[in-house]
């Protein structure tokens, strides 16, 4: 079995794949001080509860945008699972060309989204990832990653609004029933939700206009289910796309070499 670890700015997600499907996913807040032993005490207990045999895990891969967390995650894999994990970095064979000015600046999560989107749904495509930042990742008709856009995430905007305006409450995001709010909470919820829908729709239209063909538009990330219901522009809802990217990258680097071809990709509805 394969253990996939996706370490983001807000949360770290652990997931186990048995070669056919995901057996489970577990999420813990990102804490740079957390040790390998703490990961083990938490995760192995959860494995026991759902019947995942840790001894059956023979492969692992880590993708992270938090470099300081990498050391303890690798140590957890080595010391508690007896597995040397792959790390999603430039040393691996990604199988996707990157057409950006400085590939070293490109976050692993964005490249993973492009890889998984292309392999699962075909190219061209736009992946919108609703995470700590809201990212737009673009793959052209030739299957090449060619850039995108980055905007502040929804929860960052909520935090900033609360900090800058002390009388405005800290609130959770949700879809309002109307755009016109008749009290402060509803007005804030409207501005946050419909404001982000407008941002997303505007960038999707602008990016699509610059592409060589009509793209498949994919929503992923923790808030993807909420925002995908607010606009008709999304063709696919794939909340676990980054995990699928890590799985595909691990398979590519521990199995027979693979090469991309449009015929091998699965289109929408197939």
Curated annotation (Swiss-Prot):
Pathway annotation from the record: Cofactor biosynthesis; coenzyme A biosynthesis; CoA from (R)-pantothenate: step 1/5
Domain of life: Bacteria
Family matches, as InterPro entries: ATPase_NBD, Type_III_PanK
SUPFAM superfamilies assigned to the protein according to its UniProt record, in alphabetical order: Actin-like ATPase domain
Cofactor binding note: A monovalent cation. Ammonium or potassium.
UniProt binding sites for substrate: 107-110, 184
GO molecular function: ATP binding; metal ion binding; pantothenate kinase activity
GO cellular component terms given for this protein: cytoplasm
UniProt subcellular location: Cytoplasm
Active site per UniProt: 109
List of residues binding K(+): 129
Needed co-factor(s): NH4(+); K(+)
Statement: the UniProt record of this protein carries the keyword Transmembrane helix: no
Positions annotated to bind ATP: 6-13, 132
E.C. code: 2.7.1.33
BP-aspect Gene Ontology terms: coenzyme A biosynthetic process
Pfam families in alphabetical order: Pan_kinase
UniProt keywords, alphabetically: ATP-binding, Coenzyme A biosynthesis, Cytoplasm, Kinase, Metal-binding, Nucleotide-binding, Potassium, Transferase
Catalytic activity as recorded in UniProt: (R)-pantothenate + ATP = (R)-4'-phosphopantothenate + ADP + H(+)
Family: Belongs to the type III pantothenate kinase family.
Subunit structure: Homodimer.
Described purpose of this protein according to its UniProt entry: Catalyzes the phosphorylation of pantothenate (Pan), the first step in CoA biosynthesis.
Protein's recorded name: Type III pantothenate kinase
Annotated source species: Gluconobacter oxydans (strain 621H)
Organismal lineage: Bacteria, Pseudomonadati, Pseudomonadota, Alphaproteobacteria, Acetobacterales
């Amino acid at each position: 079995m394969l253990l996939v670890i996706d370490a983001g700015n807000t949360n770290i997600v652990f997931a186990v794949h048995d070669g056919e499907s995901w057996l489970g996913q577990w999420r813990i807040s990102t804490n740079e001080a957390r040790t390998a032993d703490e990961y083990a005490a938490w995760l192995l207990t959860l494995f026991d509860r759902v019947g995942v045999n840790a001894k059956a895990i023979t492969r692992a891969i880590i993708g992270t945008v938090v470099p300081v967390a990498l050391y303890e995650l690798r140590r957890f894999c080595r010391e508690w699972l007896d597995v040397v994990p792959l790390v999603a970095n430039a040393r691996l064979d990604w199988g996707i060309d990157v057409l950006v000015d400085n590939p070293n600046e490109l976050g692993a999560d964005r490249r993973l989204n492009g890889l998984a989107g292309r392999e699962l749904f075909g190219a061209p495509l736009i992946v919108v990832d609703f995470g700590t930042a809201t990212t737009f990742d673009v793959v052209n008709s030739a299957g090449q990653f060619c850039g995108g856009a980055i905007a502040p995430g929804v929860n960052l905007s909520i935090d900033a609004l609360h900090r800058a305006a002390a009388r405005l409450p800290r609130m959770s995001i949700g879809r309002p029933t109307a755009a016109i709010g008749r009290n402060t909470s509803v007005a804030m919820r409207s501005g946050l939700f419909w404001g982000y829908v407008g941002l997303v729709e505007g960038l999707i239209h602008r990016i699509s206009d610059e592409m060589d063909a009509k793209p498949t538009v994919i929503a992923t990330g923790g808030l993807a289910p909420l925002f995908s219901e607010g606009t008709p522009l999304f063709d696919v809802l794939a909340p676990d796309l980054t995990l699928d990217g890590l799985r595909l990258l691990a398979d590519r680097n521990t199995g027979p070499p693979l090469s991309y071809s449009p015929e091998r990709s699965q289109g929408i509805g197939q």
